[in-house]
Amino acid sequence: MDNLAIFEEFNSKKISQDDLEATIISLNNYFVKLNDLNNQYLNLIRQDNIDKSKKQNIKIQRKNTKIEINKIIATTKLFKQNIKLAESMYKKIKSSNNQDDIKKAQLEVDNAKSMLIQFKEAINGQGKSIKLKKLNDVAIEIKNLSFKYGPEFPNAIDDVSFTINQGEYVTIIGHNGSGKSTISKILIGVLNAQQGEIRIFGNIVHDHNIEQARKFLGIVFQNPDNQFIGSTVEADIAFGLENKRVDPKKMPDIILDSAKKVGMEWALKKEPLNLSGGQKQRVAIASTLALDPDIMIFDEATSMLDPKGKREIKEIMVQLRETRTKTILSITHDMDEILNADKVIVLDHGKLVRVAKPLDIVEDKEFLRNIQLDVPFVGLVREELEKKGIKIASTQNIDELVEQICKK
């Protein structure tokens, strides 16, 4: 049998890296389920009047979950067999004296041993060592999420559920205290919800894998001054890349490309403190883009900027939307900003009260005023024109509004 045939036979039987990751994901999900069941059980037995049937049901679920975990742990022997398979293949290849093939075969042996180590680490760490993959095209899925800042406080987030698909531009709006920014803090792991489930591209997010889940996310905060670390724009963009352990040889191209996307390539050698508010925020966006997150969260990213700065950031967000390569979640109380979104999620006192297209929200002026939100400028102009008997068709921005008025 020649070397090619030996490799083909080995490849048809070996455990691949994808097989390992799928196994660890399954293990991870069972550990999450077991942890949830344990918490349910503890909460139940603390109650004065214990529901015995519910208690028994949880005990059965815990037992079954442990059985599934043990089944997966038992596959350790398969990873050991995989090493033997690789070593057997290596011996056959070694006899050929083909140095390139011998190196290739040795790499397969090393990979097989590495996979066993990774699997054992996953068992010891309850699955937290897994590198998360996209399991579906739902960028963010939130189910029955609730959070309060302390037992004496009401829910800041109260049984909220929604989904955001990959490539969508979604805004979350609400008055101060509605829970908008609390959701962003929960998404990035700064806060832990007391109830509910968050999935990022199908992966359940929990304490064990939050660091991995964060790699899907990039966030731009309200105050650009709080986001700078480097002494120059270039150094600031490089900081995140260094933490990510990006190859230093690749960094200059990544930095330049990210700066160009926000029109700040001219400022790479400048100090961030000497830039305007809008320019600083553009650098903050460039720093986030350099890390190439799948989901970009803008948390009140325009609220501290002057009108020119606001316009610049909104234009960048629209450009990102047009590529459909990033999922954009914009948390804002700027009602003019929602007009650029694919859909709008409305919160009021921690509750989700509406999910709709921007124009549907803008047209419902009574709804906006009832939940203490401003009517966008285009909506106010249309309202005043209608009072004077001038009817204008629904418009999504000021340019469309001017065009409609000119036709009258």
UniProtKB/Swiss-Prot annotation:
Amino-acid positions noted as binding ATP in the UniProt annotation, renumbered to this chain: 174-181
Domain of life assignment: Bacteria
Single GO molecular function: ATPase-coupled transmembrane transporter activity
Location(s) in or outside the cell: Cell membrane
InterPro entries hit by this protein: AAA+_ATPase, ABC_transporter-like_ATP-bd, ABC_transporter-like_CS, ABC_transpr_CbiO/EcfA_su, ECF_ABC_transporter_ATP-bd, EcfA_1, P-loop_NTPase
Topology with respect to the bilayer: Peripheral membrane protein
A single GO cellular-component term on record: ATP-binding cassette (ABC) transporter complex
Record domain ABC transporter: where: 140-374
One Pfam family of this chain: ABC_tran
Annotated EC: 7.-.-.-
Class of this enzyme: translocase
Record keywords: ATP-binding, Cell membrane, Membrane, Nucleotide-binding, Translocase, Transport
Function of the protein: ATP-binding (A) component of a common energy-coupling factor (ECF) ABC-transporter complex. Unlike classic ABC transporters this ECF transporter provides the energy necessary to transport a number of different substrates.
Similarity comment: Belongs to the ABC transporter superfamily. Energy-coupling factor EcfA family.
Known partners and oligomeric status: Forms a stable energy-coupling factor (ECF) transporter complex composed of 2 membrane-embedded substrate-binding proteins (S component), 2 ATP-binding proteins (A component) and 2 transmembrane proteins (T component).
Name used for this protein in its record: Energy-coupling factor transporter ATP-binding protein EcfA1
Native source organism of the sequence: Mycoplasma capricolum subsp. capricolum (strain California kid / ATCC 27343 / NCTC 10154)
